[in-house]
């Protein structure tokens, strides 16, 4: 299948595929010089350099967005609607869609919110049934899983050069940033672990609130990031065995686990999310994070659904989320931004020392099928 200009050919996909390809209407917009030619099968999220954004790159991205907006908006107005499937909190997605509708009158945005498993199941069922339902899948894990099943249409943002994390097939609009967090009343600065790996030291036995590594949650993605970063199977196995040897209960909810650290039931959160930590620090809660330990970053994306009834509105929404206006809205609701040079309390550039290189989650199998990745790489060690 081929789609002109901004769309990438959808490759043959692995065993989850229903044997069909996502396709869009023939009147897809073209943005001159924004994207050159067609690309092959989409690669997964790739970390871009964390260097300072040049003024030219920022100006070019802003111009590309304005050109895209100018071309897409009239077509999106004719469509008149935008349907978002998301795992974001209701108050967050409402704030974002409300601002989008103010910016682009004539487009009515609605949303359906669920957890990732329910979202993926519904989207795949509707795709298989040929239903033109959702336009945008706004989530972390779901877009890559749906892409692997052939249920997404590849789209590369015209603002790619200003992104910290960029996937050439699915626009990355935010990030999950994991911070090594602790209760300042439960552990002394001199006793803190200085890295994620150091948490597995036996001296922290009984002190760590540990996310369940087998639930495909934040700790699972952290393990995937470290496996890629280290490229050392023996070291990776020692890390997992060390975490298991801490002999603490595992938790199914990162937010609930973080509340236990706040309450002082544990000294260290493995892990916590940076935006939650900074929010609590602002309230005077006795928590902080280890700045020497590079954050783990995971893409939050706005992917174009393969049966999108309003594809122009979907592309416009994705581009707007990445724009300076969209990132400002995302920041205002407490979510992490992904745009380089964007001033935010929760940006990597602001929250960590200059030159900090995050650990990105880029493992292809993990992004497309986290359960399979865990069964292969973690389960034999964790449950062995």
What is the predicted role of each segment?
Residues 36, 44-50, 66-77, 87-108:
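Short, polar/charged alpha-helical segment
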Residues 70, 83-98, 109-127, 132-265:
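Extracytoplasmic ligand-binding site segments that recognize negatively charged/polar headgroups
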Residues 96, 235-239, 300, 309-321, ...:
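Short amphipathic alpha-helical coupling segments at ligand-binding clamshell hinges
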Residues 143-148, 267-286:
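A ligand-binding cleft/hinge motif common to bilobed small-molecule-binding domains
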Residues 162-165, 175-176, 203-214, 239-244, 250-251, 321-344, ...:
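Periplasmic-binding protein-like
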Residues 179-186, 223-227, 298-313, 329-330:
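A bilobed periplasmic-binding-protein/Venus flytrap-type ligand-binding module shared by bacterial periplasmic
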Residues 345-384:
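Extracellular/periplasmic bilobal clamshell ligand-binding domains
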């Amino acid at each position: 299948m081929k789609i002109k200009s901004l769309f990438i050919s959808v490759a043959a996909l692995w065993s989850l595929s229903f044997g069909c390809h996502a396709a869009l209407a023939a009147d897809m917009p073209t943005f001159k010089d924004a994207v050159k030619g067609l690309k092959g099968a989409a690669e997964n999220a790739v970390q871009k350099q964390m260097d300072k954004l040049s003024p030219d790159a920022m100006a070019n991205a802003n111009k590309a967005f304005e050109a895209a907006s100018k071309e897409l908006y009239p077509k999106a107005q004719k469509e008149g609607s935008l349907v978002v499937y998301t795992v974001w909190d209701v108050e967050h997605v409402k704030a974002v869609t409300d601002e989008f509708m103010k910016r682009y009158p004539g487009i009515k945005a609605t949303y359906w919110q669920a957890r990732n498993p329910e979202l993926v199941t519904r989207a795949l069922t509707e795709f298989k049934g040929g239903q033109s339902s959702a336009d945008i899948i706004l989530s972390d894990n779901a877009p890559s899983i749906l892409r692997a099943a052939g249920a997404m249409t590849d789209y590369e943002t015209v603002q790619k050069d200003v992104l910290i994390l960029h996937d050439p097939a699915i626009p990355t609009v935010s990030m999950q940033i994991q911070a090594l967090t602790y209760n300042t009343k439960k552990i002394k600065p001199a006793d803190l672990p200085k890295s994620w790996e150091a948490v597995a030291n036996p001296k922290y036995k009984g002190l760590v609130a540990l996310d369940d590594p087998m639930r495909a949650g934040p700790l699972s993605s952290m393990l995937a990031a470290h496996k890629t970063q280290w490229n050392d199977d023996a070291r990776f196995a020692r890390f997992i065995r060390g975490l298991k040897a801490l002999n603490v209960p595992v938790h199914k909810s990162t937010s609930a686990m973080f509340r236990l650290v706040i309450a002082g039931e544990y000294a260290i959160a493995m892990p916590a999310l940076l935006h939650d930590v900074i929010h609590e620090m602002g309230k005077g809660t006795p928590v902080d994070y280890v700045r020497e330990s590079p954050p783990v970053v995971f893409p939050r994306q706005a992917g174009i659904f393969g049966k999108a009834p309003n594809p122009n509105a979907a592309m416009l929404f994705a581009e707007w989320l990445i724009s300076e206006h969209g990132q400002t809205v995302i920041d205002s609701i407490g979510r992490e931004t992904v745009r380089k040079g964007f001033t935010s309390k929760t940006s990597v550039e602001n929250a960590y020392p200059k030159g900090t290189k995050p650990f990105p989650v880029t493992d292809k199998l993990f992004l497309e099928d986290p359960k399979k990745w865990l069964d292969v790489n973690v389960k034999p060690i964790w449950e062995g």
